[in-house]
Amino acid sequence: MKIVMAIIKPFKLEEVRDALTALGVHGLTVTEVKGYGRQKGHTEIYRGAEYAVSFLPKLKIEVAVATELVGQVIEAIVSAAKTGQIGDGMIFVTPIETAVRIRTGEKDLDAL
């Protein structure tokens, strides 16, 4: 089992969710985050003054999936979230040692 964590642009959430649902991914966690990558933010003009915006609003999506699905999940996220512009985001994959569904006590893949 793996956790696939993606940092994406907020307006891409629905497309990413639809792509994951089409793969049979039933649950995901979405967190509003701020950050920057290679672009290191940008500047904005407000009332004639220029301001540096260092941290950009993003969404962090986390999904727990069977190891066999990781490649398909990554492809689905990239396809749905990609704009071709700076700041499209990143995807990270980490192992899950164990998973437990609190309500039923199901473990590991049965819990997903």
What annotation goes with each model-predicted range?
Residues 1-112:
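Positively charged, small/polar-rich N-terminal and surface patches that mediate targeting and assembly
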